[in-house]
């Protein structure tokens, strides 16, 4: 076996180790959604880079960086209302809105009015990032209708 083939064979795991996974929470339709993107650079790392795409097409779509977090982190999505969404990743809280898709901020603490109802969470299941909707209870509010045009 030539040296080039041997080097290529040894480097192969490093080249295929990067994982870029996406999962979407469709709010009212495919055009109104929150999509979590998880980039896990190397299989041996315990962290991944996270970003969120807020979309309400055709009016707006924007990608927001959430930074690094645990590779298997669960990201919960809460709905306080008014096209605002609160994301909880471990102890970190973020707020994003889908009216203009521009608003995004890290919260220092839980809002005074609370997080709102839990709509579901992004989780890694069997190695794949997935959206797991919260089961609807009798007291849960109806799904938000898309904003008026």
Predicted regions and their residues:
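Intrinsically disordered, low-complexity proline-rich regions
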Residues: 4-5, 19-22, 60-66, 84, ...
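Repeated scaffold domains used in trafficking and secretory/extracellular systems
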Residues: 20-25, 68-78, 117-121
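Short, intrinsically disordered, charge-biased short linear motifs at domain edges
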Residues: 4-7, 45-48, 85-88
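N-terminal export/targeting and maturation segments
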Residues: 16-67
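Acidic, small-residue rich beta-repeat scaffolds with periodic aromatic anchors
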Residues: 80-149
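Sec-dependent bacterial lipoprotein signal peptides
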Residues: 1-18
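Short, surface-exposed beta-strand/loop "edge" segments at domain boundaries and coil↔beta transitions
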Residues: 43-45, 58-62, 72-73, 91-100
């Amino acid at each position: 076996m030539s040296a080039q083939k041997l080097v290529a064979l040894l480097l192969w795991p490093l080249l295929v180790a990067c994982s870029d996974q996406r999962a979407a929470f469709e709010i009212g339709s495919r055009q109104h959604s929150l999509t979590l993107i998880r980039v896990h650079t190397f299989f041996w790392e315990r962290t991944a880079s996270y970003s969120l795409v807020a979309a309400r097409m055709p009016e707006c779509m924007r990608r927001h960086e959430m930074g690094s977090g645990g590779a298997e982190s669960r990201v919960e999505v809460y709905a306080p209302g008014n096209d605002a969404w609160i994301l909880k990743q471990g102890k970190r809280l973020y707020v994003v809105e889908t009216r203009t898709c521009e608003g995004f901020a890290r919260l220092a603490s839980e809002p005074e009015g609370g997080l709102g109802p839990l709509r579901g969470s992004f989780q890694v299941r069997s190695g794949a990032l997935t959206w797991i909707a919260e089961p609807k209870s009798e007291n849960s509010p109806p799904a938000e209708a898309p904003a008026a045009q």
